[in-house]
A protein has these predicted regions:
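Mobile beta-alpha loop/short-helix "lid" or hinge segments that flank ligand
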Residues: 35-46, 135-146
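N-terminal beta-loop-helix "entrance" segment that forms/cooperates
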Residues: 40-58
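N-terminal beta1-alpha1 ligand-phosphate binding loop
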Residues: 2-32
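Residues at the starts of beta-strands that form the adenosine-phosphate
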Residues: 5, 35, 107
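Active-site-adjacent alpha-helix of alpha/beta-hydrolase-fold enzymes
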Residues: 25-31, 128-138
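Helix-loop-strand module that forms the ligand-binding subsite of alpha/beta enzymes
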Residues: 54-135
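Secondary-structure boundary/capping motif
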Residues: 15-18, 47, 82-83, 119-120
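Short, flexible coil/linker segments at domain boundaries that flank nucleotide/cofactor-interacting
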Residues: 1-2, 103
Length: 146
């Protein structure tokens, strides 16, 4: 049986985040043949193109981790009707430098949970727009706003 590897990002940096709990549940529910690997974002410095010629260790580890997965899943909360800054920072690191976008042609999906009335609907729409620009084929159905 072929094993497919999905790298997942937890958009919240909070240790007890409900999105981290959701990601943990998804890992436990993964069927045989599907391996889930977290791609950590907590230790990334803020992105600047000044680093494009010499990536910091944490940023290079992020790009290396993305190279080892078949697809990406974003498990994200919604902050102020968008994605968390830490997640956007990770996307910026992974998509740079120009011409070395780690998301290009890598399938991705988005899920998230929030105690708010609209869940993570707006954050997911923003993330869809960002990932479309990053040339990542997105799963457009089924959308899940928990």
């Amino acid at each position: 049986m072929t094993t497919h590897i999905v790298g997942y990002f937890v958009g919240s940096l909070a240790k007890n985040s409900i999105n981290r709990k959701l990601a943990t549940a998804l890992v436990r529910l993964a069927p045989p043949g599907l391996e889930m690997r977290e791609i950590p974002i907590r230790d990334l410095p803020l992105y600047s193109y000044d680093y494009d010629k010499a990536y910091p260790t944490a940023a290079q580890a992020l790009k290396d981790a993305l190279a080892r997965v078949d697809a990406v899943l974003f498990v994200t909360p919604e902050y102020n009707r968008s994605i968390p800054g830490g997640l956007k920072n990770a996307i910026d690191w992974a998509s740079r430098p120009w011409g070395k976008n780690s998301f290009s042609r890598k399938p991705s999906g988005i899920i998230g949970t929030s105690p708010g009335k609209i869940g993570t609907a707006v954050a997911q729409q923003h993330l869809r727009s960002i990932m479309a620009f990053c040339n990542s084929p997105l799963m457009n159905a089924i959308e899940a706003y928990i």
